[in-house]
Amino acid sequence: MAVTHSVGDMLTKIRNASRVKHESVDLKMSKINRSILDILKEEGYIKNYNIFDKKGIPFIKAMLNYDGKRNPAINRIDAISTPGRKVYSSYKNMPRIKNGYGILIVSSSKGVITGKQAKDNKVGGELICSVW
């Protein structure tokens, strides 16, 4: 079965791997997936990621981050926009996630950025996901 929503598939794989405390998870390579992982790495939700080929198909191996007691850094990761329901927001109406403790990932004209960066740059865009 073909995956029609690569971002949703990636978020589900990260959520499931985090809940069962896997060290890493293999994800399909795409530009938007890589941009989202850059933000997750910058914000400390994942340790790192590497790109590798499996039978000529590019994949990403994301190393998940845990605290000293093996509690996952990602408590919840949810897709906001889906292929059937795109959600957009202006920078003025950008929602806060967990009163500022979580992050919002936005696809804007400036690229894939956090909700805070979107507010600072005064750009709106498609709300991809929330993480906390």
UniProtKB/Swiss-Prot annotation:
RNA-binding found in the keyword field: yes
UniProt record similarity statement: Belongs to the universal ribosomal protein uS8 family.
Keyword Metal-binding among UniProt keywords: no
InterPro entries in the record: Ribosomal_uS8, Ribosomal_uS8_CS, Ribosomal_uS8_sf
Described purpose of this protein according to its UniProt entry: One of the primary rRNA binding proteins, it binds directly to 16S rRNA central domain where it helps coordinate assembly of the platform of the 30S subunit.
Quaternary structure and interacting proteins, as annotated: Part of the 30S ribosomal subunit. Contacts proteins S5 and S12.
A molecular-function term among this protein's GO annotations: structural constituent of ribosome
Keyword set, alphabetical order: Ribonucleoprotein, Ribosomal protein, RNA-binding, rRNA-binding
A cellular component annotation (GO) from this entry: ribonucleoprotein complex
Biological process (GO), any one: translation
Pfam families per UniProt: Ribosomal_S8 (PF00410)
Record PROSITE patterns: RIBOSOMAL_S8 (PS00053)
Protein name: Small ribosomal subunit protein uS8
Coiled coil residues, start to end: none
Gene3D superfamilies found in the cross-reference section: 3.30.1370.30, 3.30.1490.10
